[in-house]
Amino acid sequence: QFFDLEYANFNNPNFNTNKQFAFLRKDSDSLFLIVTNFEDSDVNIGLNIPSHAFEYLGLSDGEFKEYTELLSGKKNKGILSSANQFEICVPKNEGVIVKFKL
C-alpha cells in the first residue's frame, strides 16, 4: 500500500514541498516512511501524517514505535501520530528510509 504525504504538508513551515518529498509504504509486517531532500543543505523536517493515512493503512494513530533508518542503520524511537509531527533530519541532496515493524 502507498500513501502520499505531500498534500498534508503544503502549508507546513517545517517541510518544503518544493524541495522535499515524502510518502508511506506498507507491507504485511512493516511500514516504511521515505523522505527525500533536494535542498543543498541538511534539513530538520517536521512531517504531518494525517489521520486518514492511519485509517487507509489500517494502523493505530498515536503509537510509540521503534524504527530503523535503513540507509544509516541507526535505531530510534518515535510516535506516529496525526496530532504531532514526525521529526527527522534529512541530509542535503539525499533521503532517508525509515522502517517501523508492525
Please provide the spans of the model-predicted regions.
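Glycan-recognition and catalytic regions of carbohydrate-active enzymes
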Residues: 1-32, 41, 46
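Short, well-ordered beta-strand micro-motif
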Residues: 22-24, 34, 97-101
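Surface-exposed coil/turn segments at beta-strand junctions on protein surfaces, enriched
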Residues: 16, 26, 40, 81, ...
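Short, glycine-/Ser/Thr-/acidic-enriched flexible segments
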Residues: 28, 38-41, 52, 72, ...
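Conserved, mostly hydrophobic/aromatic
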Residues: 33, 37, 67
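Surface-exposed beta-strand/loop patches in extracellular or lumenal glycoproteins
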Residues: 39-60
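Solvent-exposed beta-strand/loop surfaces of large extracellular or lumenal domains
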Residues: 63-85
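C-terminal beta-strand-rich structural cap/linker in extracellular carbohydrate-active enzymes
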Residues: 78-102
